[in-house]
C-alpha cells in the first residue's frame, strides 16, 4: 500500500494498526536492575507522552555549530539565539498539521509545545494511549534510589506509516530514569598527621587546582551556571547554607540558588542533588546558579527529555550546564540517541557549554554473541558535549598529583564517528599507547571520551543537615570542572567584553592540553575475563580515553581560554 493510501486512511489506522511501523525497534525494554512491576495501569489513569517531531535543516545546524565554536572561524562566538534555532529546525507545516490532526482525532486535547515546536507533550488516558500506539501496554513500576514510580510499556509500540516522515519517536513508553554516577565508600581510618586531609572539600579543590580566595565571581556580571537534577533528587537550601558555613569560610560565595526551573520537591534531600549544587557553587563561587529540577513523575514521563524541552523553551539561559547522569548506548534506540544528539547540537549553536559525567563503570562491559565488548555511555559519547572523567590523589590523604580513578568512564562510541576536532589527538593515542585492549573490544573509529577530568574520589557533602564523607564518582568531578572552573573563566571573558566559551571541544583540542595537568598514571576497569583481566584503557602523555586532556590548572587555563 502506498503512502497516499496510508494518508487517506490515517485516522482509521489509529484503531486498525495497519500500514504501521516501529519507530524504535532497537529500544531495549528489559527491566533495569532495582525496578519491579506493580501490574497493569488503570485504563482511565492519565499519563503524558512526548512526541519528537521531525526537524528540518539538521545538517545546516551542524555547520553552524562548527562555525561558532572554532576559534579560527570568523563566526567564532557569534552564537544563535533560540529564535534563530527555532527558525532553522522548526518542523515543516505538513509535519505540524499531520501530527496535530492525528492527535486530535485520537482525543488528545491537552497538548503543549515548545518555542522550537519540535516537541509536543500530550496528556491522555491509558486507554487512549494504547489505542493511539498499537502494541503498547502500560504498567506501573517502582525502583531507583528514591523508589520512583513510573508508567512504562514492556512491549513495542507502532505508529501509522504515514507518520514516518514526521515523528522521530514517542517518549514516555520504554526508557526508565537515567542512572547516576555516584558511589559512597565507608570512611577510611587514618591517624591524624600534620598536612593530611580527610576527604575532598572546597579548600582541597582550590589548593590542588591553584584557585585563590580572589578567584570568585564578581557578582556584577551577567554570568550564570546550572546543574540538572532527575530521579526525584532534590537539594535543600538549609544543606547548602550549612555546607558553606563548614567549608566556604575562606572565599566569597552565595548561599542560595538564584533560580529553580521546574518542580522542587519537599521530600528528603538527595546526596546526588546536594553534591551537584554544593560543589558547583563552591568551585564556581559567587556566580549566579540555577537548578533544573526534572523529577520525571508528574511533569513528564522521561526526566531527561523534560530537561531538553526546558532548554528549548527559554531564551536566556545560564552559560554552563552540568549533568551527572547517563545510560549505556546499547540500552537506547537509535532514533532516541540521534534526536537527543540534535538537541545537544542546538544547545551548542546557542553558545551553551554542556558538561556530562563520563560514568562510573570504567570502559564498561557487556556480552555480544558470547564475546565481551566495552560498553560506552550516552550522552557522554555525544560529539557535542564536553565529557568529564575522574581522578584520585596519588596519596589519598595528601594534596598530591593525580592518578586515574579506576571507575572513571571512558572509551569509544559505537554510534557516533570520531569528530574532526579530535582526529589528531585520538590517532596519536591509538598509535602510541603501549596498553591498548584488543581491537575487538572497542570501536576505534568512534567518538572518544572523556575530554577532561577532575577529582572524583572522597568528597564531603551535606545532605539532610548531616555532613557525609567519602562520596565519589564523576558526578563530583563534573560540577567542579564544568560549572566551577569554566564559569570562572566565563566571568573573565564576559567582563572583558568577550562571548562565553560555548561548546568547548574544538578549542580544547586545538590547545593540546594547555592549561591542564596531564594525568599519566593509572588504568580504569573493564571486563573481568581472561583477555583483558578487568583492565580497560590506561592514561598516558597527552589525551587518553580515561582522563581526557587532564585536570584544571587554574592560573594557566584562563590564559589559554581568554583569547579571542
From Swiss-Prot:
Disulfide cysteine pairs (residue numbers): 111-122, 365-527, 523-538
Location of the Peptidase S53 domain: 199-564
Short name of one Pfam family: Peptidase_S8
UniProt binding sites for Ca(2+): 518-519, 540, 542, 544
Residue ranges of the TM segments: none
Cofactor list: Ca(2+)
Positions of the pro-segment in this chain: 20-195
Record's catalysed reaction(s): Release of an N-terminal tripeptide from a polypeptide, but also has endopeptidase activity
Superkingdom, taxonomy of origin: Eukaryota
Gene Ontology annotations for the cellular component aspect, listed alphabetically: Golgi apparatus; lysosome; melanosome; membrane raft; recycling endosome
Post-translational modification: Activated by autocatalytic proteolytical processing upon acidification. N-glycosylation is required for processing and activity.
Known partners and oligomeric status: Monomer. Interacts with CLN5. Interacts with CLN3.
Protein name as annotated: Tripeptidyl-peptidase 1
Origin species: Pongo abelii
Gene it is expressed from: TPP1
